[in-house]
């Protein structure tokens, strides 16, 4: 096959192949897998999750060597849940193939192969990627210098990409896992020859190198025309290169590191000393070798658990057998150099590797991943640098971007060092200049690994126009997206740089780090014909200077440096880094656009940069990290985003209630702000704005935490005149008062970091006339709105800084916080919210001496009412704070209360009921979240229509979270108000059902004599002439009456049925249920069944009906609680007797929680016995078993009779029983929840205050496991073990 081939000779040494015309990528020697062939025993097929686990386990172990096995499992499990459908389908397909007994690697590779086999090849060739190079075409011209190319791969290295020769910029492999690609010999000869003659770029792409040793020895490779000789020389030593390999000039060596490390992009460039002015510009051969974590790991990786002797440990590096004594654990393994870490030993910083470019003075940058130092290379000192590398560099991975346009011979070479973190990298070529473009395609889904696209622009190619990322796209002329990619994507899933400004870290996410990815090679460049792109206004272009700026200073915050008197070096912008370049005109502009941390969750929390060591602020407070911002927050209510400047303050990204906005388009077009929004866009805007408000607005509940804000409000309300700068000629008068103009200080969207649009009148985001309402001000001001230009976000940004003392209600009303707190205090006293709002407005009018028209007053009332309930929903509040400090989450006695006059008017609300009977379970979290979202939406969009139709079956009761059961039910849809009182004894019927004498499912087969006998036992009258059907109907009517609750009272017309609630003996609310239909025993059963612990004694005036209803609704549960006693102290078939219940007495403090959570046994009484009793003294003649439910039968319950009598005249009961009627359903439910919380929390605060007053020095108030208040006494004397013991004593 020898033939002339432009004088270029390539000799490929193969393993087990004697022909020199084929290049394959076999894997390393390893044990072959056994599948269902030749009768061999097969391995147990693994699940998709297990395949993913094996792929990513080793990487996580190396990235986080200090984590225990359980934490690693949690992280991998979490990342599996976060995988997208496409990412998970890869492992599902592999699992399916493995289950079928096929080799998943070869099968998947065969499925993605696009090039058929060449005729004539032997079928015994390895099933892998190979390149056919005609040997006959390599024997011609050999007058040019040669390039030695050596690509060596470790035995332990995982699967890498194969080499595939592409013939045109557009013929990029479209699949990530191609197994077999070959090019015809004749076509390759013709096309490579054409490329060589035209001076184009020869590309060698990589998709997937199988795990075998690949060695190209003595391979001379030459690109270019024979009359333009030049030599390519650049030596790059990868991390983890031990020793100093002797490599001659003109060779390229890429030794592969250990498993799990990334491999840099290797660019082979020409030698400037051999080039001439006529040499074609920017000709090179690029070998993109993607990170090992990107390709599939070998299946030989096993999860092993090594057991060592007590007090000993082993090295975590696979294959290393080093053991150590735990007490003398070294920081790194002396055998393999693996970092072992320690409690107080930080990981050392990786050594720097320097790269010096042999030619070109254009902009050069290295993208440095997380936990890395910048990597540079010097051509003449590659051997020295290689020998200095240590094994600790296994943690460091670099990406080296080299751009080398031609220049004059002898010009001094320069190198630049740039640190770029969490950034999109965009290298933009200036018009008329020769260079390359590096484009970062933005990752559009939260949690997806960032991609860096390396490419060159070509105006002749279809994809020449490189669009800018969404963060920096100009609003006037958005660039079209390319039809085909023109760059090489280097995916870096497992690494990420620390943020420049010390921003907080997100939660770890692994996200399919081992999934194979595709590498896209750059298109050839045409000299002097670079494409031009306009720089967006959102971020300024970088100035090109000769000096390298200092990206990082020392480890102190800028505010700390300022206090210490040190100079502060501030970057030009939050997402900009200035990259210098030499004096040459042939330069490229580099722009770094910052990516929000939410977009790319990092692997780990630690970083290699020096930690911030800021000076202390006031105790319990923190300051914004932006040195130019003076915003101060309380630690308990620290916002995620600074409301003043928009800087990210959060440290933890785990947010369950809100989801990040997912962008479906890789490069979304910027919204045209001149066109009105469509219906779909308005819905997107609504959701985004609500998410923004919940994320940024977090109002403290305690007024003391806002003392400084109230002082500011008072100062601005006083409107003082201050004389300053008084001189002989001039007098300066300063007036402190409220501003007339309010807008959000943010310039970027606080959700997606896109630029914000600020428009004029009648635009999508223009200024609006707004009321300013304070205790002494009632005036109109201007509120400016800004809108996010990301079409997938469109969030409206208004003035929402509560620490200025104002709360924004839909840019229609700015009300001071002291007025909202005043309304709350009035509601706490039982005042109708609408009355309180009218009192506030009347007071303000009197103070300002302004008279409002009826229309203006009505508008202000509605705005202030909606704003108040949104203010309550945005207040940070823990509803467990209302749990009684004496009873805790498991009171021994609970008493039923009702509020029949606390109702909702039905004139503006229509309740609907499901057409078919479904589950009785209701979702408590969803119901209350819907109520909160509704009022917040009314504030964000005042023109939105409130809820007018309500599904009554989803109304959930309210419990403190720790007192709520696992399943919460509402069976009001099954309640029948038309059921008439039926004669007969329900108690007797329930007893017959429990004994099995009567079975309703067999009632049709009973004879008339048996039916008459059952009716007599139940006391149901019947006639001798009644038919069998009439007898059955009489029996079923009694059953339905008992199950329905017997006493379903119809509420007043056009009103709901009020609410019922249960309280502990200290009048703290334990649970509430809001009724649409009239109250019945069924509602009390729902309330009891939805509680975390069914109380041992439940006091209700309809005790018999509640007990019988519970027997029919939950027969198995009641059989455990009271057997056949039907909730009585003794059997209802026998005369009532006095029963002693010693478990109900006050017992000594105990925290015994040995019983399981869902056990029927009560955690305080330690018994399963429950009773339903009443406190009535008058016997009920219609209820023969009422005497068995009397509270007086138990002497231990005698004190509670006094408590019940005192509740009627108590203050909390008076507040709760105030008659009130609401027109707005959302406000009604939120009001009742707020009232339950405020009245209960006031009682608990008094309990805490009493205990604090009795505390001795050294004692603190705590809550125990059952959430009861107690006093913990901490012994200061050191015990023999050197530990402190806590002895708790209950305070009742």
Curated annotation (Swiss-Prot):
Record flagged with keyword DNA-binding: yes
Biased composition (Polar residues): 370-391, 562-572
Highest taxon of the lineage: Eukaryota
Locations listed in the record: Nucleus
Broad class of where this protein is predominantly found: nucleus
SUPFAM superfamilies cross-referenced by the UniProt entry: HMG-box (SSF47095)
TM region positions: none
Region (Disordered): 363-391, 448-505, 562-588
GO CC annotation, single: nucleus
One Pfam family linked to the record: HMG_box_2
Organism: Homo sapiens (Human)
GO molecular-function terms, A-Z: DNA binding
Location of the DNA-binding region in this protein: 42-110
Keyword terms, alphabetized: DNA-binding, Nucleus
InterPro entries referenced in this protein's UniProt entry, alphabetically: HMG_box_dom, HMG_box_dom_sf, HMGXB3, HMGXB3_CxC4
Name listed for the protein in its UniProt record: HMG domain-containing protein 3
Biased composition (Low complexity): 467-478
């Amino acid at each position: 096959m020898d033939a002339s081939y432009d004088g270029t000779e390539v000799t490929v040494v193969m393993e087990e192949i004697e022909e020199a015309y084929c290049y394959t990528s076999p894997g390393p020697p390893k044990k072959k897998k056994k599948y269902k062939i030749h009768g061999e025993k097969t391995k147990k097929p693994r699940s998709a999750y297990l395949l993913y686990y094996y792929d990513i386990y080793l990487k996580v172990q190396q990235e986080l060597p200090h984590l225990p096995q359980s934490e690693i499992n949690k992280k991998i499990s979490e990342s599996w849940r976060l995988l997208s459908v496409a990412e998970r389908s890869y492992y599902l397909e592999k699992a399916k193939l493995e289950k079928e007994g096929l080799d998943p690697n070869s099968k998947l590779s065969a499925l993605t192969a696009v090039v058929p086999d060449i005729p004539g090849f032997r079928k015994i060739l390895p099933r892998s990627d190979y390149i056919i190079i005609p040997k006959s075409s390599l024997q011609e011209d050999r007058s040019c210098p040669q390039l030695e190319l050596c690509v060596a791969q470790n035995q332990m290295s995982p699967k890498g990409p194969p080499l595939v020769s592409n013939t045109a910029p557009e013929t990029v492999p479209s699949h990530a896992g191609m197994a077999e690609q070959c090019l015809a010999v004749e076509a390759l000869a013709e096309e490579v020859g054409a490329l060589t003659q035209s001076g184009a770029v020869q590309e060698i792409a990589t998709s997937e190198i199988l795990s075998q040793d690949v060695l190209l020895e003595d391979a001379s490779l030459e690109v270019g025309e024979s009359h333009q000789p030049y030599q390519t020389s650049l030596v790059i030593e990868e991390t983890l290169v031990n020793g100093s390999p002797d490599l001659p000039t003109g060779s390229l060596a890429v030794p592969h590191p250990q498993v799990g490390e990334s491999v840099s992009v290797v660019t082979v460039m020409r030698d400037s000393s051999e080039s001439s002015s006529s040499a074609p510009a920017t000709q090179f051969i690029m070998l993109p070798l993607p990170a090992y974590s990107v390709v599939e790991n070998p299946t030989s990786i096993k999860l092993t658990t090594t057991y060592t002797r007590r007090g000993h440990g082993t090295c975590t590096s696979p294959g290393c057998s080093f053991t150590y004594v735990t007490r003398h654990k070294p920081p790194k393994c002396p055998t393999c150099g693996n970092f072992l870490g320690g409690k107080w030993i930080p990981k050392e910083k990786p050594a720097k590797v320097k790269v010096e470019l042999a030619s070109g003075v254009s902009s050069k940058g290295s993208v440095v991943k997380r936990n890395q130092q910048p990597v540079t290379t010097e051509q003449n000192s590659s051997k020295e640098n290689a020998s200095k590398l240590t094994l600790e560099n296994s943690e460091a991975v670099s990406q080296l971007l080299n751009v080398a346009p031609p220049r004059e011979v002898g010009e001094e070479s320069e190198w630049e060092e740039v640190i770029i973190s969490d950034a999109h990298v965009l290298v933009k070529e200036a018009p008329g200049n020769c260079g390359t473009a590096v484009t970062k395609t933005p990752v559009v889904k939260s949690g997806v690994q960032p991609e860096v696209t390396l490419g060159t622009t070509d105006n002749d190619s279809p994809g020449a126009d490189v669009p800018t990322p969404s963060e920096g796209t100009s609003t006037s002329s958005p660039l079209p997206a390319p039809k085909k990619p023109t760059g090489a994507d280097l995916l870096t899933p497992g690494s990420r740089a620390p943020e420049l400004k010390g921003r907080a870290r997100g939660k770890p996410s692994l996200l399919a780090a081992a999934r194979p990815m595709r590498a896209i090679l750059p298109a050839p460049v045409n000299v002097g014909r670079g494409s031009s792109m306009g720089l967006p206004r959102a971020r300024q272009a970088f100035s090109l200077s000769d000096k390298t700026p200092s990206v990082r200073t020392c480890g102190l915050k800028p505010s700390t440096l300022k206090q210490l008197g040190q100079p502060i070096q501030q970057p030009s912008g939050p997402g900009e880094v200035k990259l210098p370049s030499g004096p040459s005109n042939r330069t490229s502009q580099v722009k770094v656009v910052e990516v929000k941390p939410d977009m790319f969750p990092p692997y780990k929390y630690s970083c290699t940069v020096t930690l911030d060591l800021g000076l202390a602020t006031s105790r319990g407070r923190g300051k914004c990290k932006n040195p130019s911002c003076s915003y101060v927050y309380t630690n308990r209510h620290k916002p995620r985003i600074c409301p003043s400047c928009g800087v990210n303050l959060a440290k933890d990204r785990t947010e369950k209630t809100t989801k990040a906005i997912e962008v479906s388009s890789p490069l979304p077009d910027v919204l045209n702000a001149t066109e009105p929004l469509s219906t779909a866009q308005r819905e997107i805007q609504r959701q985004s704005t609500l998410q923004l408000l919940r994320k940024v607005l977090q109002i403290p509940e305690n007024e003391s935490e806002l003392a400084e804000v109230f002082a500011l409000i008072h100062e601005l309300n006083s409107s003082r005149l201050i004389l300053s700068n008084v001189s002989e000629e001039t007098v300066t008068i300063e007036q402190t008062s409220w501003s007339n103009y309010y807008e959000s200080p943010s310039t970027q969207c606080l959700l997606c970091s896109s630029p914000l649009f600020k428009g004029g009148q009648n635009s999508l985001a223009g200024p609006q006339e707004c009321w300013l309402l304070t205790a002494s001000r009632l005036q109109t001001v201007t509120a400016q709105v800004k809108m996010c230009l990301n079409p997938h976000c469109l969030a409206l940004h208004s003035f929402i800084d509560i620490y200025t003392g104002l709360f924004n209600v839909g840019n229609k009303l700015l009300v001071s916080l002291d007025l909202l707190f005043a309304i709350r205090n009035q509601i706490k006293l039982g005042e109708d919210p609408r009355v309180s709002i009218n009192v506030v407005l009347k007071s303000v009018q009197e103070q300002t001496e302004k008279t409002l028209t009826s229309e203006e007053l009505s508008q202000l009332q509605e705005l202030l009412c909606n704003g108040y309930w949104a203010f309550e929903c945005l207040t940070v509040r823990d509803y467990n704070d209302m749990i009684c400090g004496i009873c805790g989450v498991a009171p021994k006695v609970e008493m039923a209360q009702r509020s029949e006059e606390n109702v909702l008017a039905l004139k503006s609300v229509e309740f609907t009921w499901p057409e078919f009977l479904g589950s009785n379970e209701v979702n408590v979290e969803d119901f209350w979240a819907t109520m909160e979202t509704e009022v917040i939406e009314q504030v964000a969009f005042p023109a939105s229509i409130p809820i007018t139709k309500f599904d009554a079956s989803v109304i959930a009761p309210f419990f403190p979270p720790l007192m709520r059961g696992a399943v919460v039910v509402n069976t009001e849809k099954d309640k029948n108000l038309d059921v008439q009182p039926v004669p007969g004894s329900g108690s007797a019927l329930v007893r017959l059902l429990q004994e099995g004498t009567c079975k309703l499912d067999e009632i049709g087969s009973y004879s008339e004599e048996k039916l008459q006998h059952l009716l007599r036992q139940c006391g149901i009258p019947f006639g001798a002439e009644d038919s069998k059907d009439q007898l059955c109907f009489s029996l079923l009517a009694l059953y339905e009456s008992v199950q329905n609750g017997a006493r379903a009272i119809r509420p007043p017309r056009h009103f709901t049925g009020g609410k019922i609630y249960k309280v502990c003996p200290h009048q703290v609310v334990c649970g509430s249920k809001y009724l649409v239909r009239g109250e019945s025993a069924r509602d009390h059963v729902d309330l009891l069944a939805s509680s975390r612990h069914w109380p041992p004694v439940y006091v209700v005036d309809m005790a018999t009906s509640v007990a019988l209803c519970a027997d029919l609704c939950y027969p198995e549960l009641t059989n455990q609680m009271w057997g056949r006693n039907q909730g009585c102290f003794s059997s209802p078939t026998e005369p009532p007797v006095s029963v002693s219940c010693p478990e109900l007495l006050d017992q000594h403090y105990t925290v015994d929680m040995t019983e399981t959570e869902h056990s029927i046994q009560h955690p305080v009484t330690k018994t399963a016995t429950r009773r339903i009793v009443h406190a009535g003294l008058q016997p009920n003649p219609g209820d023969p078993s009422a005497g068995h439910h009397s509270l007086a039968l138990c002497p231990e319950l005698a004190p509670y009779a006094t408590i019940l009598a005192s509740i009627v005249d108590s203050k909390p009961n008076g507040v709760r029983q105030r008659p009130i009627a609401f027109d707005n359903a959302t406000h009604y439910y939120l009001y009742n929840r707020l009232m339950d919380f405020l009245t209960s929390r006031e009682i608990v605060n008094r309990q805490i205050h009493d205990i604090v007053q009795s505390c001795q020095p050294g004692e603190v108030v705590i809550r125990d496991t059952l959430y009861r208040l107690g006093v913990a006494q901490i012994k200061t004397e050191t015990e023999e073990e050197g530990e402190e013991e806590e002895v708790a004593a209950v305070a009742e």
